[in-house]
């Protein structure tokens, strides 16, 4: 199973927290000390906590669970999309729309509209419209794709959230808490760990650190899914006998 070592984390700068004046005292148990007015995260805590989170995500994937990757700030956006796509999972990487989980009924209607517009753009419907109407629909399609493209094939609520930056994505975390969906999150020294089921104390800004987390999670999800596919194949083989 995918695991991450102390050396990997040091190389990626996972241990660099935020400036000391921005700290959240609830993160004290995970802070090693300060250097040049920047908090240093205790990787002796982070390494086992991250590997424990990976093991749990592996189990969720092995039982066909859906993982929703959430990272809407610019530093994480592209990497979040790539990681989710690489393991056939789902993502929100632009803006978290309030109610995305708690008001799933409405979101489902917007997804239906997005799929209808996609069909229209491909079956020649747009070409039959006036220029103005076609432009309006194209803009609507782009807007919906931006907001919902990463969850349009999710087919229901996710079984877990993997979040980059608990502070920035606090609305998503609150919605998951309300619905009892487990939250796995990268929590920096300026963030509140409350509401996060699997806290991963670490830098949430450095591209290398963000890529390290996402790469490991995508790998563990792929592994979990292949276990599920292998057991399905075994079952059908037994039935055939």
Swiss-Prot record:
Statement: the UniProt record of this protein carries the keyword Ribosomal protein: yes
PROSITE patterns xref list: RIBOSOMAL_S2_1, RIBOSOMAL_S2_2
Keyword line: Ribonucleoprotein, Ribosomal protein
Entries under CDD domains matching the protein: RPS2 (cd01425)
SUPFAM superfamilies found in the cross-reference section: Ribosomal protein S2 (SSF52313)
InterPro entries (UniProt xref): Ribosomal_uS2, Ribosomal_uS2_bac/mit/plastid, Ribosomal_uS2_CS, Ribosomal_uS2_flav_dom_sf
GO biological process: translation
GO CC, alphabetical: cytosolic small ribosomal subunit
Entry GO MF terms: structural constituent of ribosome
Keyword Ribonucleoprotein: yes
Family: Belongs to the universal ribosomal protein uS2 family.
Protein name according to UniProt: Small ribosomal subunit protein uS2
Gene: rpsB
């Amino acid at each position: 199973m995918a695991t991450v070592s102390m050396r990997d984390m040091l190389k990626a700068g996972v241990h660099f927290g935020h400036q000391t004046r921005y700290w959240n005292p609830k993160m004290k148990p995970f802070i090693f000390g300060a250097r040049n007015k920047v908090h240093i995260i205790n990787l002796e805590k982070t390494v086992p906590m991250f590997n424990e989170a990976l093991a749990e995500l592996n189990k969720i994937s092995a039982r066909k669970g859906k993982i929703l990757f959430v990272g809407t700030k610019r530093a994480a956006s592209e990497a979040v999309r790539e990681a989710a796509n690489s393991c056939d999972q789902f993502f929100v990487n632009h803006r978290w729309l309030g109610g995305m989980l708690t008001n799933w009924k409405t979101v489902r209607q917007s997804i239906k509209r997005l799929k209808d517009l996609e069909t229209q753009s491909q079956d020649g419907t747009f070409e039959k419209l006036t220029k103005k109407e076609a432009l309006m629909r194209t803009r609507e399609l782009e807007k919906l794709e931006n907001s919902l493209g990463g969850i349009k094939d999710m087919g229901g609520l996710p079984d877990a959230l993997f979040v980059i930056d608990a502070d920035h994505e606090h609305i998503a975390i609150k919605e998951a808490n309300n619905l009892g969906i487990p939250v796995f999150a990268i929590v920096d020294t300026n963030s509140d760990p409350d509401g996060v089921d699997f806290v991963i104390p670490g830098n949430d800004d450095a591209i290398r650190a963000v890529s390290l987390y996402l790469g490991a999670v995508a790998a563990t999800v792929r592994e979990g899914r292949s276990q599920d596919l292998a057991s399905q194949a075994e079952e059908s083989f037994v039935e055939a006998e």
